[in-house]
Design a protein with these regions (language model features):
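Short beta-strand/loop segment at the start of cytosolic alpha/beta domains
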Residues: 1-18, 23
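Amphipathic alpha-helical interaction surfaces in cytosolic regulatory modules
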Residues: 25-115
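Residues at or immediately preceding the N-termini of alpha-helices
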Residues: 28, 122-123
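Short acidic-hydrophobic, aromatic-tinged amphipathic segments that line or gate anion-handling sites
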Residues: 117-121
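A short, charged, amphipathic alpha-helix used as a generic interaction element across diverse proteins
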Residues: 125-131
Length: 131
């Protein structure tokens, strides 16, 4: 996991997980444990920076799905669904940045980009969280 994850905290608001290497069955649980640990310490907003991620497997996609569920308030999602009739809920709490083309392709074809906002780079993604 040490090779996969580096954590940066933006003062007062967003935690950035910088991923590198492979997100697969060997690393997914460690990533989820890091999310749990940061959430317990008060993390509310998470940006996953993917620039150095080389590969994501189905286990890695499962980890992203679990992270989305962990960081998206259920009541907010339910209210969105009632109000927006079939439009997908986009997380305000969990976002992605800097995905290489091969990772972007997998995320898109698997349907993740319907619910998780993605940005071309970290500064743009950070700005999307607002103040």
């Amino acid at each position: 996991m040490a090779d996969l994850l580096t954590i940066t905290k933006v003062p007062g608001r967003v935690t950035i997980f910088h991923l590198a290497g492979k997100l697969d069955g060997q690393t997914n649980e460690s990533l989820l444990e890091a999310v749990r640990k940061e959430q317990a310490a008060g993390m509310r907003f998470l940006l996953l920076e993917l620039q150095a991620l080389e590969m994501i497997t189905s286990a890695g996609l499962g980890a992203l799905h679990n992270m989305f569920k962990m960081l998206s308030p259920k009541a907010e999602m339910e209210a969105w669904e009632k109000e927006h009739h079939g439009e997908p809920y986009k997380s305000a709490y969990f976002k992605l940045a800097g995905a290489p083309p091969n990772i972007y392709y997998v995320l898109n074809i698997a349907g993740f980009l319907s619910n998780i906002p993605i940005y071309p780079d970290t500064p743009t993604a950070l700005a999307s969280f607002g103040d």
